[in-house]
């Protein structure tokens, strides 16, 4: 079972860089990278709100659940 983080896809669709998003939401690029690679242990609701606001998306567009085969 895995949670897949689709931030790269959303950023590409919006022609936005990770650095630009990080700056807009007040997060370091390093911490955003940890989130993008799925290495984050937790995500604050306030961070999700900021990402969704800037990317004009829903939380379910950022994360998806994939079962192991």
Outline where the language-model segments fall:
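A short, Lys/Arg-rich alpha-helix, primarily the initiator
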Residues: 1-16
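Residues within the helices of the helix-turn-helix
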Residues: 8, 19, 49
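Short, charged recognition helix plus adjacent turn
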Residues: 9, 34, 41, 63-69
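The alpha-helix within a helix-turn-helix
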Residues: 11, 22, 52
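Residue at a beta-strand N-cap/secondary-structure junction
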Residues: 15, 42-45
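Short alpha-helical DNA-recognition segment
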Residues: 16-34
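DNA major-groove recognition helix of helix-turn-helix/homeodomain DNA-binding modules
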Residues: 46-61
């Amino acid at each position: 079972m895995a949670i897949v983080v689709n931030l790269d896809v959303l950023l590409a669709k919006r022609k936005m860089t990770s650095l630009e998003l990080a700056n807009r939401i007040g997060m370091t690029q390093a911490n955003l990278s940890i989130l993008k690679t799925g290495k984050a242990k937790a995500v604050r609701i306030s961070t999700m709100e900021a990402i969704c606001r800037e990317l004009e998306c829903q939380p379910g567009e950022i994360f998806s659940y994939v079962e192991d085969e």
